[in-house]
Amino acid sequence: MVPQELIEKIKLISPGTELRKALDDIISANFGALIFLVDDPKKYDDIIQGGFWLDTDFSAEKVYELSKMDGAIVLSEDLTRIYYANVHLVPDPTIPTGETGTRHRTAERLAKQTGKVVIAVSRRRNIISLYYKNYKYVVNQVDFLISKVTQAISTLEKYKDNFDKLLSDLEVLELENRVTLADVVRTLMKGVELLRITEETRPYIVELGEEGRLARMQLRELTEDVDDLMVLLIMDYSSDEVDEETAQAILQDFVTRREPSPISISRVLGYDVQQVSQLDDILVSARGYRLLKTAARIPISIGYNVVKMFKTLDQISKASVEDLKKVEGIGEKRAKAISESISSLKHRRTSE
């Protein structure tokens, strides 16, 4: 999974940017290039040797022309200035590198040493490689990116339909107070899969730049509420009460680091289970955060107060408007919104 800090750097060379135009022109002319992005060139006097000082306005055309010389080009990080051209970059030779070509070995060492962006264009393979800190990202062809994104969006649509169906089924069980841990874990796992595909797709969309505008809108529409729903599910079903920040951290752990399984998700939620078959036998009760937020439009900050008083969704559903009004932050309007939203859901489920 591509880390967010690297995604921000990939944006610098996405189609539609001036730097990408320069890189594409360099490849079309069958040139190579080594480009170093810095905040203050004077800080790197021991690394930047030879060449000549320009300190001129940045443009794609200038970068292309300067790439005709053998040396590297030094640009400002905000891509407004060209500082140096035709320089020799001398990073610490003891820094390990897995690259073979001279240009790419220099780029990798320089990025590791300085923590800055270094871009290498291979003359022989016509490939753009971006190095940043200890990361390396090889830029993909637009046709390949479009194909990958289209396939991912199609997969996401199916996963989102399944996730919505599981949430709908869970809602029925919640209102009937017969949710099992298996129901919760199944829903969470589908949501994690959905979010993982989203995170894997995001770098491709970023790399597409202007070409990825439609895909970016589709991705946002498909997943804009999934993160919030997952956090609310974790808050609803953790064996011990957790706040929103803790639930978000648990979710990120599932999405970015853990290989989620029914057992691992159950244990993180606080349930001591040894076998998957146990999940069907463990009855759990929702606290009500998700219903309060999504159906009654009650802010989380007020939802805490409701859950603190009534403990579970089942108890909230049995409370009268007058009972609900005793909660701090709940007036007549919000009390009716909670009561009516629960009644409406029960009525809708009964009539289906």
Swiss-Prot record:
Catalyzed chemical reaction(s): 2 ATP = 3',3'-c-di-AMP + 2 diphosphate
Which InterPro entries does this UniProt record tie to the protein? DisA, DisA_sf, DNA_integrity_DisA_N_sf, DNA_integrity_scan_DisA_link, DNA_integrity_scan_DisA_N, DNA_integrity_scanning_protein, HhH_motif, RuvA_2-like
Origin: domain of life = Bacteria
Q: Which positions does UniProt annotate for ATP binding?
A: 71, 89, 102-106
Which cysteine pairs are covalently linked by disulfides here? Answer: none
Q: Pfam family of this protein, just one?
A: HHH
Q: Which GO terms describe its biological process?
A: DNA repair
Q: Which cofactor does it need?
A: Mg(2+)
**Which keywords accompany this UniProt record?**
ATP-binding, DNA damage, DNA repair, DNA-binding, Magnesium, Nucleotide-binding, Nucleotidyltransferase, Transferase
Instruction: Determine if Cell cycle is one of this entry's keywords.
Output: no
Q: Which GO MF terms are attached to this record?
A: adenylate cyclase activity; ATP binding; catalytic activity, acting on DNA; diadenylate cyclase activity; DNA binding; hydrolase activity
Which EC number(s) does the record attach to this protein?
Answer: 2.7.7.85
Domain DAC spans what residues? 3-143
Give the family from UniProt: Belongs to the DisA family.
| HAMAP family reported in the protein's UniProt record | DisA
Q: Which NCBIfam families match?
A: PRK13482.1
Tell me what this protein is called. Answer: DNA integrity scanning protein DisA
What organism is recorded for this protein?
Thermotoga neapolitana (strain ATCC 49049 / DSM 4359 / NBRC 107923 / NS-E)
